[in-house]
């Protein structure tokens, strides 16, 4: 298992249990899954773009991404229902903890002009969503082999009931929220 998972079991659980007054260890919020999503609008014109995006996503996450398709036709965007328009990966278990560790310790500090993550990006149920403008912040991506710099969405799904609990959980891992 990843070091952050051991840190969670040894330190974070007891800290959150005393902070929020949980009676059982099972009430303590935990990270359930991390979802990475990359929308590739240019995939309509060139199929190679989606393949490159999928290979970048596979390198970042360590597992093969699912190609997402358009749910409905939109004439303004010139897409039809069923067209491939992006890719996504859902990480759970040990891969999730390894990715989370790389995100917090390596990738986020490599963001240019970084001033902290917005603490208001919680959804009301303790889940946190953030956007990354360039995939090259991850060490697995070779800058010279990238055809185009593209961003991705990262959603951290927790078992927290409120935003306050979710913020406390992520802050316990030194998640860099803006003050």
UniProtKB/Swiss-Prot annotation:
GO terms for cellular component: ribonucleoprotein complex; ribosome. Keywords: Ribonucleoprotein, Ribosomal protein, RNA-binding, rRNA-binding, tRNA-binding. GO terms for molecular function: rRNA binding; structural constituent of ribosome; tRNA binding. The keyword Lyase does not apply. InterPro entries: Ribosomal_uL5 (IPR002132), Ribosomal_uL5_bac-type (IPR020930), Ribosomal_uL5_C (IPR031309), Ribosomal_uL5_CS (IPR020929), Ribosomal_uL5_dom_sf (IPR022803), Ribosomal_uL5_N (IPR031310). GO terms for biological process: translation. It comes from the Bacteria. The keyword Ribosomal protein applies. Belongs to the universal ribosomal protein uL5 family. Part of the 50S ribosomal subunit; part of the 5S rRNA/L5/L18/L25 subcomplex. Contacts the 5S rRNA and the P site tRNA. Forms a bridge to the 30S subunit in the 70S ribosome. This is one of the proteins that bind and probably mediate the attachment of the 5S RNA into the large ribosomal subunit, where it forms part of the central protuberance. In the 70S ribosome it contacts protein S13 of the 30S subunit (bridge B1b), connecting the 2 subunits; this bridge is implicated in subunit movement. Contacts the P site tRNA; the 5S rRNA and some of its associated proteins might help stabilize positioning of ribosome-bound tRNAs. This is Large ribosomal subunit protein uL5. It comes from Psychromonas ingrahamii (strain DSM 17664 / CCUG 51855 / 37). The gene is rplE.
């Amino acid at each position: 298992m990843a070091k952050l998972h051991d840190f969670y079991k040894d330190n974070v659980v007891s800290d959150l249990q005393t902070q929020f007054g949980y009676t059982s260890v099972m009430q303590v919020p935990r990270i359930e899954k991390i979802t990475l999503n990359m929308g590739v609008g240019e995939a309509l014109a060139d199929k190679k773009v989606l393949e490159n995006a999928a290979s970048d996503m596979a390198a970042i996450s360590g597992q093969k991404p699912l190609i997402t398709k358009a749910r409905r036709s939109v004439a303004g965007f010139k897409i039809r229902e069923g067209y491939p328009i992006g890719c996504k990966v859902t990480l759970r278990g040990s891969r999730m903890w390894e990715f989370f560790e790389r995100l917090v310790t390596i990738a986020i500090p490599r963001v240019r002009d970084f001033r902290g993550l917005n603490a208001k990006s919680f959804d009301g149920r303790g889940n946190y969503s953030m956007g990354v403008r360039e995939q090259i912040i991850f060490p697995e991506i070779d800058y010279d082999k990238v055809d185009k710099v593209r961003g991705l969405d990262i959603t951290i799904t927790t078992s927290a009931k409120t935003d306050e609990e979710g913020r406390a959980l992520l802050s316990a891992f030194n998640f860099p929220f803006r003050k």
